[in-house]
Amino acid sequence: MSDAPDTGDKGEAAGKPAGAKPRTEPKAPPKSARRRSRELALQGLYQWLLNRNDIGAIQAHLHDAQGFNKADREHFDALLGGAVREEARLTAAFEPFLDRTVDELSPVERAALLVGSYELVHCLDIPYKVVINEAVELTKTFGGVEGYKYVNGVLDKLAAQVRAPEVSARR
């Protein structure tokens, strides 16, 4: 054992050449424009669900938000406007698959279900598994610890109903 102070640099003793740069975690891939639009739509729906502010004002505020320039504006507008406009219809579509009332859902879960339901019904160019995965990721990012599992289960059942041929072909 050496009396030399430990500098924390193990160098060659740790299997790394002396002077090697410390390993850093790889950067996460950049978010897609559609993912950003979903995140912003979820945030707008969250605001709208909590206080029913004018959706036009919420939309304008989010258009000015930092990072909006990297979002798919058309997809954002379709998601936010469509989910609000069709809230009753979309809720009626996923409500049979809930094990609690809609009012008992967290606002994040409810917003994610609205985004996912809207995409399942209207965005047929997006595979249903992508729609579900994106809603799950939104819930993991913004929701409670286990909420994503619930959103996954509800949207999976809804997909089997509204996209039956696509789901059957994948199973």
Curated annotation (Swiss-Prot):
**Superkingdom of the source species:** Bacteria
User: Which Pfam family, any one, appears in the UniProt record?
Assistant: NusB
Q: Looking at the keywords, is Transit peptide present? A: no
Q: Which InterPro entries match?
A: NusB-like_sf, NusB_fam, NusB_RsmB_TIM44
Q: Which HAMAP family match?
A: NusB
Biological role stated in the UniProt entry = Involved in transcription antitermination. Required for transcription of ribosomal RNA (rRNA) genes. Binds specifically to the boxA antiterminator sequence of the ribosomal RNA (rrn) operons.
Per its record, how is this protein called by name? Transcription antitermination protein NusB
Q: Which organism is it from?
A: Cupriavidus metallidurans (strain ATCC 43123 / DSM 2839 / NBRC 102507 / CH34)
